Amino acid sequence: MELDLALDREEGALQASEIGDLLDETVWLQQLEHWLQIVCGDESLDCPTLVRSAEELSLGLRFIDDATIADLNSTWRQKTGPTDVLSFAALDDAGDWMEGPSIELGDIVVSLETARRQAQEQGHSLQQELRWLVSHGLLHLLGWDHPDEKSLATMLALQERLLGDG
């Protein structure tokens, strides 16, 4: 399976010295392809059949600032203030997915400023926090959700597995 990644970054949210490989498109492409192979390759995990069988998947990954994500959070979730990650699935109902060689998954939007704060609060690197947030967003694009504590625990366990596998 091949991934077509559209990466957009507002580098102004980070100092030049902080960026390094954090916002490198090739690094994120390899990481996302690896995570998709894990989820799609394990029949015990929920993943839309059309995604499992697709020759090509496509998604957008956007790194932005708190002001921009706060606007999106207000518009799409009717919540005030910034959040860490938002996912916009191309299709929420698996029955609506169109068959074809390429499947559009949707977009993952991450606030670099919130990610930096959370990394500092958790005592780990910004890279680790970004990987956590992007993996969480990816699972949402694949249909995972956490309306209750049990489903949240299951989703977080899968995130830990993804991060542990590279």
Swiss-Prot record:
GO-annotated molecular function: metalloendopeptidase activity; RNA endonuclease activity; zinc ion binding
Source taxon at top rank: Bacteria
GO cellular component: cytoplasm
Chain positions recorded as Zn(2+) binding sites: H136, H140, H146
EC number: 3.1.-.-
Location(s) in or outside the cell: Cytoplasm
Keywords: Cytoplasm, Endonuclease, Hydrolase, Metal-binding, Nuclease, Ribosome biogenesis, rRNA processing, Zinc
Cofactor note: Binds 1 zinc ion.
Biological process per Gene Ontology, one example term: rRNA processing
Keyword Glycoprotein appears in the UniProt entry: no
Cofactor(s) the protein needs: Zn(2+)
Pfam family membership, one: YbeY
Record-linked InterPro entries: MetalPrtase_cat_dom_sf_prd, YbeY, YbeY_CS
Entry function: Single strand-specific metallo-endoribonuclease involved in late-stage 70S ribosome quality control and in maturation of the 3' terminus of the 16S rRNA.
Family: Belongs to the endoribonuclease YbeY family.
Name by which UniProt lists this protein: Endoribonuclease YbeY
